Curated annotation (Swiss-Prot):
Keywords: Cytoplasm, Nucleus. The keyword Nucleus applies. It comes from Schizosaccharomyces pombe (strain 972 / ATCC 24843). Belongs to the UPF0652 family. PANTHER family: UPF0652 PROTEIN C16A11.03C-RELATED (PTHR31560), UPF0652 PROTEIN C22H10.08 (PTHR31560:SF0). It is found in: Cytoplasm; Nucleus. One of its GO terms (cellular component) is nucleus. This is UPF0652 protein C22H10.08.
Length: 492
């Protein structure tokens, strides 16, 4: 499938406005025709042999200094940087092959016949990219090196030298089933049950067991009905399990946002102002916005609803990000944006997707507060990799907050409760204090080096929240967070 076909496929996976409310459960989002649509961007779960190749890839990239050596402004000419890129890529490919098959690796080192092993190298880099999508907290900086390797391999000069590039589309459930004429398995009436996530929270053991058995029966029904000479029962099950994985992924990303919206609506009203817990902010002390209590309340709630919609489309955004970074027609240039050297590259397809999502959020709001500017391919968000990384911070910031409130509700440590009563006037008072602080200073337009990159733009809303998270250690309630089990906002 060529790049244009992939682009259209990925963009078509984003649900039309009438299908979205932003509040449905992951299971409901994956009902019948929607399931088929979403499968276009859901990665297939890695198999055992693929995991062994993944370990090989990550080990090779971990010891590579590729990005440090090529992403620097010190090269005197493009030709010298190109030579360094080619040297770095061939070194890693050689290392991977030597570790995988010593004899073949020695031949590769001697004859430099990389093209003979093109499919192997494409496969191993596809495995790494596919794994990252379903495991965003894994790989760390290794993923950046991985993507920049693939990106640089798309350059005509490097393709000519190697005889191939490292890009292979991420293997999705849709593509896997489509190649085996088994897409109708996702239209089966039992598909929703077979792919649902079973959540144990606040449920009885008998109810959980009932769901487990119903899910197992549904999986077996579909596997028996749709297997053929082209696809085994086990492969059908594997596809269903992959979709179930994606349901868990969505719940992890979306639930903290939905729960925080519920907390905000429970503790605050836009029309009632408590002087002690007012949300009003002025453009002073780092803040770049000036909002009344009413305006700030709606600004925060709208931002949270926007993030909820973005997290609901995160698989589509991941797929488009992968496509943007490896697009040879969109050249990047190295820039220094005062946060290090970055590759700045246009992101037209992600922009289309984000504009659709933003339009949905605006249609769900009576009045949109703040800017509608989307930073992409500029100094604020230089490329698709940093775009995805930025929005994956949302659950990392909000999950510890939601868990803290849950921990406070169940807290029975008398010493800690006495401290909370003495220092903060009780646990409910403390919860409202933390929420007020988050809603005021996590959405005040702060956190960037200049007015253009901050403020109320779509990107700036998240910049402010991350700035608040980075300064959490300065808050009066920080020690309570630590005593309640809080560690950090880094996703661990």
């Amino acid at each position: 499938m060529d790049a244009e076909a992939l682009r259209n496929l990925y963009l078509s996976s984003i649900l039309p406005n009438e299908s979205k409310t932003g509040n449905e459960s992951p299971e409901k989002k994956f009902s019948s025709p929607v399931l088929l649509q979403r499968a276009k961007v859901i990665p297939l779960r890695l198999e055992y042999e693929e995991r062994k190749l993944l370990h090989l890839l990550t080990a090779a990239l971990d010891v590579s200094d590729y990005t440090d050596s090529v992403d620097t402004l010190s090269f005197s000419s493009p030709a010298k940087r190109l030579a360094q890129q080619l040297k770095g890529i061939t070194a890693v490919l050689s290392g991977i092959m030597v570790a995988y098959d010593y004899k073949v690796g020695q031949e590769l080192l001697e004859h430099k016949n990389f093209e003979q092993h093109a499919e192997f190298f494409k496969k191993i880099f596809e495995i790494g990219r596919r794994y990252k999508v379903l495991n965003p907290n894994r790989l760390g900086s290794t993923y950046g090196k991985l993507m920049y390797f693939v990106q640089d391999s798309m350059r005509p000069e490097i393709q000519d030298a190697l005889g191939f590039n490292l890009f292979k589309p991420i293997l999705t459930v849709y593509e896997f089933l489509n190649e085996r004429d088994a897409l109708n398995a996702l239209e089966d009436p039992y598909a929703e049950i077979a792919t649902m996530e079973i959540v144990a929270e606040n449920r009885s053991r008998s109810a959980i067991q009932k769901d487990i058995k119903a899910k197992e029966r549904a999986v077996e029904h579909i596997a028996k009905k749709y297997y053929s000479s082209k696809i085994t029962k086990e492969k059908v099950r594997w596809c269903l399990y992959s979709i179930a994985d994606s349901n868990s992924y969505l719940r992890y990303n979306r639930d903290p946002i939905a729960k925080l919206i519920g907390l905000v609506e429970a503790y605050f009203s836009p029309d009632t102002v408590d002087d002690e817990f007012t949300l009003a902010i002025d453009a002073i002390n780092g803040s770049r916005l000036k909002h009344s209590h009413y305006k700030q309340y709606h600004y925060v709630v709208q931002s949270l609803h926007l993030w909820l919609l973005i997290m609901g489309e995160i698989f589509s955004l991941w797929a488009l990000s992968d496509l943007e970074l490896t697009n040879p027609d969109m050249e990047y240039k190295l820039i220094d944006n005062n946060q290090g050297i970055h590759r700045m590259q246009p992101c037209p397809n992600i922009r289309i997707a984000m504009e659709r999502i933003l339009r949905t959020a605006q249609e769900q709001s009576e009045t949109w507060i703040g800017s509608s500017t989307i930073h992409l391919g500029d100094t604020a968000v230089p490329n698709a990799l940093l775009f995805i990384d930025k929005y994956m911070q949302v659950p990392r910031i909000l999950t510890p907050l939601v868990l803290l409130f849950k921990e406070l509700d169940s807290l029975n440590d008398h010493s800690l409760l006495n401290y909370i009563d003495t220092a903060f006037g009780g646990r409910e008072y403390l919860k409202k204090t933390i929420l007020t602080d988050f809603m005021r200073f996590g959405f005040d337009g702060s956190g960037a080096d200049n007015w253009f990159d901050a403020g109320s733009c779509i990107d700036g809303r998240l910049t402010s929240a991350w700035n608040w998270a980075n300064n959490i250690h300065t808050k009066d309630y920080y020690r309570v967070l630590l005593m309640s089990g809080f560690l950090s906002f880094n996703g661990e």
